């Protein structure tokens, strides 16, 4: 397995790159290209911190809004081919080019970790036997939604479309037909729904919280497929001449800015398609995303970094211990080493992410269902300043609390207090998030004034619609 760096949102990765990058290769300097529209990275800092940094010159870290379409291979016409991000310039960051192309790596307690079967429908790694055949979570969810909602599809080609891991979302008709041909049983879906309904009644006979069928942990787990494909090319984004970033580091920092913007764009799409979130007032949607994007991206880095933690070892006295974590996964296929983080002056943040988040998550054996539920809870925070309708947000968050509590009771019934243990990870996440954001703001890689407009524009026009029947 190739090494990967720790999880961190664009804020941390951009900051760290300032000292992690190697000097630019010899030769004439690259021509400066005009900067596209302002990029958005945001989050409110305490007023005192904001005022103390007012003297720092602003940075032009901009993004072409068309790029929010997330089309693979999109390059801005203002970015010549030679200006594509050069990962070889990033000291401490390694591209996992040797990773098997057909299998993605999963954290130790991920539902797909250790699976030896392939999905009969698309060939992805199977999470188990569902409705009669070995299948992945994506095809399982697709088949279940099709049956439960009695959906019908049409093929635009000749009803013989290729259904594999990369093309399974292109034709729903052929995907459904392949599910049937491989042996998936419609009646098994209905039987499962009846069993779940009876179980819910027995577990909470007098519960006043009615969790909708749409807002569920299962649905949120399927939505994780919205994460951008790491194999896609990134439009090159230049850091402006007035930034605090040393000139020789601006190219690699710009590359990470671009990666960060792409992840934020995917985050906007993910948030918008959470059931009922889109029914909130647009202003409230913007406020919620603006207040949580930093934590959510940092949480994703901690989740991915679990895979790169070394296993515990048994000492002579029978106790168990682990070595200091050395790798953080900034994004799929890219890792950051602890030495590089220390050289950049963010070693303390690096260690906190791995020790207070990744290690604790592994100790808890946090699975993906719990992870996505916590992400939704972070987003749906009724205490965020500026909300117009806190009650609606509070109702949604209470539903997520109920979903997570119910999941813990069903899946870990022998672990009393698990629900509370999971929630106790959130204060640490918040604290680390604020500290990492201070570094981003210092280098003016966060456009505080334009983030709200960026999110609003993405929610209105630029975020591509998600077909819930074709997710994963």
UniProtKB/Swiss-Prot annotation:
Heterodimer of USP and ECR. Only the heterodimer is capable of high-affinity binding to ecdysone. SMART domains: HOLI, ZnF_C4. PROSITE patterns: NR_LBD (PS51843), NUCLEAR_REC_DBD_1 (PS00031), NUCLEAR_REC_DBD_2 (PS51030). GO terms for molecular function: nuclear steroid receptor activity; sequence-specific DNA binding; zinc ion binding. Belongs to the nuclear hormone receptor family. NR2 subfamily. Residues 212-462 form the NR LBD domain. SUPFAM superfamilies: Glucocorticoid receptor-like (DNA-binding domain) (SSF57716), Nuclear receptor ligand-binding domain (SSF48508). It comes from the Eukaryota. A zinc finger (NR C4-type) spans 119-139, 155-179. InterPro entries: NHR-like_dom_sf, Nucl_hrmn_rcpt_lig-bd, Nuclear_hormone_rcpt_NR2, Nuclear_hrmn_rcpt, Retinoid-X_rcpt/HNF4, Znf_hrmn_rcpt, Znf_NHR/GATA. The lineage of its organism: Eukaryota, Metazoa, Ecdysozoa, Arthropoda, Hexapoda. CDD domains: NR_DBD_RXR (cd06956), NR_LBD_RXR_like (cd06943). This is Protein ultraspiracle homolog. Composed of three domains: a modulating N-terminal domain, a DNA-binding domain and a C-terminal ligand-binding domain.
